[in-house]
Amino acid sequence: ALARAKALDKGAIKGLLHGLPIGVKDLFDTHDLPTSYGSSIYADNYPSTDAVSVALMRQSGGIILGKTVTTEFASFKSGKTTNPHHSQHTPGGSSSGSAVAVGDFMIPLATGSQTAGSIIRPASFCGVVGYKPSFGKISTAGVKSLAPSLDTLGCFGRTVEDVALGIAAMSGDHELAKVSDLHNKVRIAICKTPEWQYACPETRGALAIARFS
């Protein structure tokens, strides 16, 4: 990573992520770092190529600083990750390490994947911006699959602008880096699932206030 940073310092701007250190969820193949998919079974697995999204981030000047913890195969046993704001609270999963690394100011950007709630959940638990784009927007080639009909790639950052850069680089669609101001209030639908009864009073209160503001 340091060698790449020095090389980038000497050259012309390569792209949207020039010189930015990036964390890569340990479901994404990386040719120069082990990819274990969160499992001891693949502890010594070194892929021969990068996942497509990782390759695109490198082409945009990003520096892959390391791999971030994921639950095993994005679904099973959780990894050793601690919520950056409260050591006794869960960081959420399965993209737990990426959300924690951004939330704890280790890195400005990190990749994630979501089949059910694996980006938006850890983002909310760790107080960072997590974005899951539309299905198929970012190529999943080179990423361990959980459910191909649902798997979607995204990323984490501390601001919407940072995440927009990450998504633009990962997808190869640099138009996505443009962030527009909202001129009208956003309408958000809330689906109260059976688990709603377990929401704490603070959560219920915050949503009630947001509903009328």
Model-derived features: positions:
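Structural signal for hydrophobic packing residues in well-ordered secondary-structure cores
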Residues: 5-12, 58-61, 132, 139, ...
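Short beta-strands and strand-loop turn motifs
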Residues: 33-37, 66, 147-148, 188-193
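Short catalytic helix/loop segments, enriched in acidic residues and glycine
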Residues: 46-53, 206-212
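Short glycine/serine-rich loop segments
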Residues: 49-167
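Gly/Ser-rich, acidic/histidine-flanked active-site/gating loops
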Residues: 172-213
